[in-house]
């Protein structure tokens, strides 16, 4: 399986206590996390247009039809299949996957075939199709309580279904879609479009706010953990932190403070005090969400061998593709298109480990409560790395084309992947003591 695919704050924000930079001492202590999110009843007083009331847990309707076995799509990476379940209803590349956050028993996938499906992880059984899209479905996700599922296609058509009834409850046509995300504690959907707008809708009423950025695409975004702010990155390298209630930008980073190319990804730490942004300029910037100031810049170090790039292509081809914070140590991971996984020590702002893949990294995710980071790449393999040592723990194979997205269950027992081979796969993760 060695051959490679051809396709390439508001005033309430806690102080920046995690940025007490010090010397060369070894990082061995667990970072004390924020005691928890603010009470939803408090938030509703501050965002009167959003309902934060907890909704009762409902069991999803599990009626549906069982997938018939289908022939695999022959690709360029034949080899062993470590997966437990394969979902094969898509007829083209599968671009996105998300798991329902309440039970982690359902997945939603969207693909190049203009289709999205909600299906069960345990056996691949289809629950329902999210029908009616007219372009490639590039975004899909469940609401915070798993009662709603949203899908979005490249043309900007967004749709929301009630999971238990399988009925469409809302739709909207925005501009060309760049990203989409649910609010962490309310039935509120956010999306960024190519005209520079960030949209926020209350679902299913459709109450809407827009946040106008520069006249260029809003390429990535993330709601901060407090639910009151969002960080959005733009094609011109600008970063904006928005107040979701007031509709104004709290901080704007541009020019030398921003990036020198389009932003590709953004992440926040667990208490929302720090933001990481990545760009095609190959830089990852560490930003204080409180002050809006850049407090660290990470750049890739030269790697002797770059199997996935031709000679002299690194400066033109490399970029930051994915990044994220460890929840238990002051570490951040950055994944690059050239296949480099860089683990940075936030306390000393130094490179701690550099782990090389044979082809470009598509996405990375940290396992909750540990220092293990997962990567998926263009060679069709999922890898698990110990960020403390830089050691490869294990890998999972089974796709015959590049992996385009993946999701990790809350207990890290399942990895769900999507691929250019028209398949989604479920892998059972063997979890040794971390």
Curated annotation (Swiss-Prot):
It comes from the Eukaryota. It holds the Pfam family WD40. One of its GO terms (biological process) is cell differentiation. PROSITE patterns: WD_REPEATS_1 (PS00678), WD_REPEATS_2 (PS50082), WD_REPEATS_REGION (PS50294). Residues 39-62 have a biased composition (Acidic residues). Gene3D superfamilies: YVTN repeat-like/Quinoprotein amine dehydrogenase. SUPFAM superfamilies: WD40 repeat-like. Keywords: Angiogenesis, Cell membrane, Cytoplasm, Developmental protein, Differentiation, Membrane, Phosphoprotein, Repeat, WD repeat. InterPro entries: WD40/YVTN_repeat-like_dom_sf, WD40_repeat_CS, WD40_repeat_dom_sf, WD40_rpt, WD_repeat_multifunction. One of its GO terms (cellular component) is cytosol. The keyword Acyltransferase does not apply. Residues 1-63 are annotated as: Disordered. It is found in: Cell membrane; Cytoplasm. The keyword Repeat applies. PANTHER family: ANGIO-ASSOCIATED MIGRATORY CELL PROTEIN, MITOCHONDRIAL DIVISION PROTEIN 1-RELATED. This is Angio-associated migratory cell protein.
């Amino acid at each position: 399986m060695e051959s490679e695919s051809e396709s390439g704050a508001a005033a309430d924000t806690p102080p920046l206590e995690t940025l007490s930079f010090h010397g060369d001492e070894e990082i061995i202590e667990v970072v004390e996390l924020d005691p928890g999110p603010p009470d939803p009843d408090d938030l509703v007083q501050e965002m009167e247009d959003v309902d934060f009331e907890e909704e009762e847990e409902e069991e999803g309707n599990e009626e549906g039809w069982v997938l018939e076995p289908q022939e695999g799509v022959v690709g360029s990476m034949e080899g062993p299949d470590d997966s437990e379940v394969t979902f094969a209803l898509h007829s083209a590349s599968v671009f996105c996957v998300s798991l329902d956050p309440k039970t982690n028993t359902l997945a939603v996938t969207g693909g190049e075939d203009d289709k999205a499906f909600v299906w069960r992880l345990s056996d691949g059984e289809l629950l329902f199709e999210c029908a009616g899209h007219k372009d490639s479905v590039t975004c899909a996700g469940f609401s915070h309580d798993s009662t709603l599922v949203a899908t979005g296609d490249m043309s900007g058509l967004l749709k929301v279904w009630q999971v238990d009834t399988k009925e469409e409850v809302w739709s909207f046509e925005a501009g060309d879609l760049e990203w989409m995300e649910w609010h962490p504690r309310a039935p509120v959907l956010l999306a960024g479009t190519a005209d520079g707008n960030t949209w926020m809708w209350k679902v299913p009423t459709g109450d809407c706010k827009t946040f106008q950025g520069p006249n260029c695409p809003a390429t990535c975004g993330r709601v901060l953990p407090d639910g009151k702010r969002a960080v959005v990155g733009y094609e011109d390298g600008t970063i904006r932190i928005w107040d979701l209630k007031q509709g104004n930008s709290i901080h704007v980073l541009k020019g030398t403070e921003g990036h020198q190319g389009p932003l590709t990804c953004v992440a926040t730490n667990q208490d929302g005090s720090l933001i990481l942004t990545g760009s095609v300029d190959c830089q990852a910037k560490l930003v204080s969400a409180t002050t809006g100031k850049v407090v660290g810049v990470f750049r890739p170090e030269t790697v002797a061998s770059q199997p996935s790039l031709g000679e002299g292509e690194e400066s033109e081809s490399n970029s930051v593709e994915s990044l994220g914070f460890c929840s238990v140590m002051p570490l951040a991971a950055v994944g690059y298109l050239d296949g480099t996984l860089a683990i940075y020590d936030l306390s000393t702002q130094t490179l701690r480990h550099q782990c090389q893949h044979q082809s470009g990294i598509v996405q990375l995710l940290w396992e909750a409560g540990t220092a293990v980071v997962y990567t998926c790449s263009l060679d069709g393999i999922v890898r698990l790395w110990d960020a403390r040592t830089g050691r490869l723990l294990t890998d999972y194979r089974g796709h015959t084309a590049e992996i385009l997205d993946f999701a990790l269950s809350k207990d890290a027992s399942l990895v769900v992947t999507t691929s250019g081979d028209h398949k989604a796969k479920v892998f059972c993760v063997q979890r040794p003591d971390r």
